[in-house]
Amino acid sequence: MPSVLVTGASRGIGLAITRHLSARGWDVYATARSAADVSALGQLPHVHPVQLDVTDRAAVAGLPEHLPARLDAVVNNAGIIVQGPVESLALDDLSRQLDVNVTSQIAVVQAVLPQLRKARGRVVFMSSVSGLITLPGTGAYSASKYALESLADALRMELRPWRLPVSLIEPGPTRTDMWGGALDDYDRMTDRLSPAHRELYAAHLAGNRKLLGRMQKLAGDPDKVVKAVDRALTSRHPRRRYRCDHVSRAQLAFLAVTPTSLSDAVFAAATTSTR
């Protein structure tokens, strides 16, 4: 029975991946931060829950003790979203965005690579179309995904001598609890802004909120993301990148043939409300 480590497995895409792989006969070592989530994961067949905060360096360094000597794959799924105009970003929030979405993912890979080498295993990173496209208000999140894309590319080439594939999953908006609560999160972010920034960016904040509502309606099926992860783990020749929805592909196709000045104007208009 193959074994896989899935981080951020307690909800959303991570939980869907965990359920799918356990049903397919994988031994899933699934991480979650809270004791309650660990307990819930423990009720699933073939799932071995591990309580872990991926930003806890000592805990991540000790992660191999909770895993089998031979590990067939790791799916780096843990992540958060920090929203807001760059001018108003709290630097601590920006640091946490990069820590959770970038540094901690690399820390996990560094910790388990010896076990992956024994199995000639695979590395999968949960990236995003936001690692290829940046919209106003998404600078921090996009920065984390752009960084992850670059690090994954470097890692893929560096691991070639051991034939360890590295794949990036690049979904767009997906129907999960994270996206379901996106408007509430956005409103909390807006409430935390200073009055001056709220006034300066009023049109942008209102426009971005409308866009979020539209994107929630267009959010894709999480099954498509789960199937992309499955292919990355089981295909004889896994792809370097898996794009999961038509909306994201259309956006990328638009960017490929559009001058930056025009795409900037289009994206700025899409995230600005005139009333």
Residue positions per predicted region:
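C-terminal beta-strand-loop-alpha-helix "lid" module of Rossmann-like NAD(P)-dependent dehydrogenases
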Residues: 161-213
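Conserved glycine-rich cofactor-binding loop
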Residues: 10-11
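Conserved NAD(P)H cofactor-binding loop of Rossmann-fold oxidoreductase domains
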Residues: 77-82
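Residue(s) in the substrate-gating loop at a strand-loop-helix junction
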Residues: 128
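Substrate-binding pocket helix/loop in short-chain dehydrogenase/reductase
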Residues: 85-86, 93-95
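The beta1-alpha1 cofactor-binding region of Rossmann-like NAD(H)/NADP(H)-dependent oxidoreductases
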Residues: 52-62, 91
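Active-site helix of classical SDR
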Residues: 109, 144-147
